[in-house]
Amino acid sequence: MSDLLGIGYSGLKAYSRALSTIGDNIANAQTPGYARRRLEMMEAVGGGNSIFYRGNTNPGGVDIRGIDRSVDGWLIEDSRITSGDAERSATKLSWLDKVEGALSDETNGIKTGLTKLYTTADQLTADPSNRTLRAQFLQSVDDIASGFRTAAGQLDKMGEGIEGAAASEVDQFNADLGALEQINIGLRKARPGSTNEASLLDERDRLLDKLSSQAGVSPTFDNNGAVTLRAAGSGDLLVGGGVVNPISVTAAPDGRLSYSVGGSPLAISTGSLAGLAEGANHVADQRAALDTMATDFANQLNAAHQAGADANGNPGQPLFTGTSAATLTAATLTPDQVAAANASGSNGNMLALGAMRGANDPEARWSGHLATQAQAVSSARAQDA
């Protein structure tokens, strides 16, 4: 009878633990990193008819072997790779969208200003002495310069924003590396099959998921489940053997980002950190292109205006000053100083200015630049789909 009671008690105890495990699974179904657990049970071998051997073994009930986590290593690895690629694409796209907004006519009015400049020049060909039209011409010049300054300021803020975001993400990445090493220490001490071990393994996987979404990492595991983590591709050690090697980020003067570990360059090609680097490269390219375009526009329009004569017969003055998009400024001119005339007549220079309008004029080049930016955003959006 006592044997039957013992067998029954072991069964009740085992299934009570099993129900508790099921409850944990239900409660943590949406918890990041949590893996479904299963209680492993085995037959408990009872006593035999001899203290030296068990020729006639009696049943002994149920023994609890431990907790098993239901995980698929291949699926987890594939999920982390997919997550890294998705985060890179999404992060890059978010900054390219912001660049498109900064360059849009709704934000800076450059395209509207250029169109207005040529439209007013056309109107001045019919009425070159009209002071209202002359004032409108100068206002369009000021609008163009203001638009370039606005766009430059927006891009500067984006560069600062990306740099700040990268610094914050690197800090979080390094904090997670430190936390992962603490998990390693705990796993080496944990009893195999225990709830504590399962919880540590869950937290380990959660941290690896986070790290993989930020940068490419390659984990390997020892018999205790402790992880050695290396950077994907380069193989640089990040965590392992009681060592944690934090990464760092540096911004160049133009805003481009570079990463390093242990003082050596670290190439990151996936994850949100890669997306930030690609976004920073795009912003830097756009800032340089905006400066070049502003300078070229100013030189081209200045040369065209200086080729004419104003209402008093004086040579035309430059319309713009400044050497970059951020410093481009409309020159202080009066309506009488608009150089509408040239040697061919009182409206000759406005006719010449209008004739510039074509495939390579400032208006067309700006439209082409916006189209290229839109194509870059479209490509990034397709990658993010």
Protein language model features and the residues they cover:
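S/T-rich, low-complexity, solvent-exposed segments of bacterial secretion/appendage proteins
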Residues: 1-385
